[in-house]
């Protein structure tokens, strides 16, 4: 079985990931669980051959030099895949994350009116956060797709690598891949401010300079979407502020309080009948939240989110209870993801 056949099989099974690891048979992750494919174990040379088969010369050199590399790969008629190739104790390994060829709409994903309001904002910072594999890219792709169908904007994305491919409809969309089209997130963001964008998507806000430039872009009249690997809205604020040195923290809190539109922290939960759905914690940049950010009272944010339901805010547990009430998720699976399991 060649790599294209393996990836086609993986996509047909509804897998989020295909795992290749020397010394073991191929495995897939379906609905959050890793399962073995009924194939013989692959040795190092077989795994390496499968990986090298889809790499270009630059990617092979990068892999051999750094012992790991990231890239994306298309299987026409099947899907697009985000690939991480690496080495492990038994030899070569790789993980192929499935990126659906069709961008799901906000309606299909069950994203409510509050998400449309975020997307319709003329300027500000929207952060979508969560652990790896929590559906952040899917959520952001739906929001970009909504803009593409309803606004006449210039949308600039900076990604590592490009995941969902957007065709320009009403919007002009330029997608830039780090290490292919630009040297780094920070370099691309610095240029972005001179490229007449209305909307900027930053695939990952992973360092001080990128975060600083994203805040500046939001402050200077752009709608900026970004991701972080934090697990709650409050932790997201802490993470951003903590990146900066002590003498800049007050300034950063002030910038955040002025520009923050929303923090959406999400996790994927198993659905009744198969598949997974995102549960969201939603914190909006209300005057109360802005004051808490400015005054460094992050601990009080949770109660502000709880009491802001009429505005569209919700804690993760409120989001999980809503999914249970709608019959989409069982109490048991909601309890596994809840911050306060006793509430279920």
What residue spans do the PLM features occupy?
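Short, flexible helix-loop junctions that flank or precede catalytic/ligand sites
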Residues: 1-344
